[in-house]
């Protein structure tokens, strides 16, 4: 019902198993159902760790971005930047990597740290590529 009322539909879902780096079946199923129902982007939260990313029918599903505010025994976290334009073309999605420790979060600025972070995300994701600048794309578009 919402799809005709907006230019770009983002669905935010609280889901998943805490501290599990891979999404469980109900997450992938629900994320894909959201895309099938008209969502342009699905972003999940709750696991307190980064989870993989996939493109389903050309639309991104970001299963979890980790803990940005709260400290965690697993410090990796990220921001997701979504850049839209007025022409209605596909948005550019970028990951901004960070680490959370002792109650604060810092963004990674060292190129080696960023590259290691992107390689990790690719390893837990599903057929995606991440450029040196953090831009996400389906592997078949690289």
Each language-model region and where it sits:
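Acidic, metal/ion-coordinating pockets
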Residues: 1-142
């Amino acid at each position: 019902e919402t799809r005709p009322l907006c230019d770009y539909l983002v669905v935010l879902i609280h889901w998943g198993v805490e501290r599990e780096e891979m999404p469980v079946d109900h997450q992938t199923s629900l994320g894909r159902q959201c895309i099938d129902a008209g969502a342009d982007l699905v972003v999940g939260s709750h696991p307190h760790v980064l989870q993989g990313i996939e493109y389903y029918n050309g639309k991104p599903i970001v299963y979890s971005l980790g803990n940005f505010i709260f400290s965690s025994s697993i410090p990796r976290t990220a921001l997701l930047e979504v850049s839209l334009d007025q022409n209605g073309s596909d948005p550019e999605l970028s990951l901004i990597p960070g680490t959370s420790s002792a109650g604060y979060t810092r963004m990674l600025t060292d190129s080696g740290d960023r590259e290691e972070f992107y390689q990790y995300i690719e390893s837990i994701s599903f057929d995606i590529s991440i450029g040196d600048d953090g831009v996400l794309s389906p592997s078949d578009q690289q």
